[in-house]
Amino acid sequence: MPKTLKISSAELVAQARAQIEEIDAKDAIALVEDPRVQFVDLRDIRERKHSGYIPGSFHCPRGMTEFWVDPESPYFKEIFGEDKKFVFHCAAGWRSALTVATLNSMGFEAAHITDGFADWVKQGGPVEKDD
């Protein structure tokens, strides 16, 4: 028998979206050439390989994000110490909304693509694929 949750995943995402910076896909596409912007792909590596990725994006597994951005963590990645605007995305914008809300609460400023990589593709954003 399924357990009753105190809050649904949809409610968590809605709460996150209410407190973070969202960038729609069209505006995000305009930033792809900006050297001051770093796109961060939270999708599973299999999603990235299957669907392609935003050119120049950095792959950061969702489960490691908080550790990779924290300079005091043994898992810290130097890219997150750069003076850039970080724009996170996933496939539909749900995981990235939750991620950015968590990162903002840690003091790490970031934004996300509202409807994710799916909308990026729909809006004609550039996509790279590895052979």
Language model: regions and residue ranges:
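Rhodanese-like catalytic fold shared by cysteine-dependent sulfurtransferases
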Residues: 1-37, 45-85, 94-131
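Active-site flanking residues adjacent to catalytic metal/cofactor-binding acidic residues
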Residues: 40
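Short, surface-exposed ligand- or partner-binding patches at beta-edge/loop junctions that are enriched
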Residues: 89
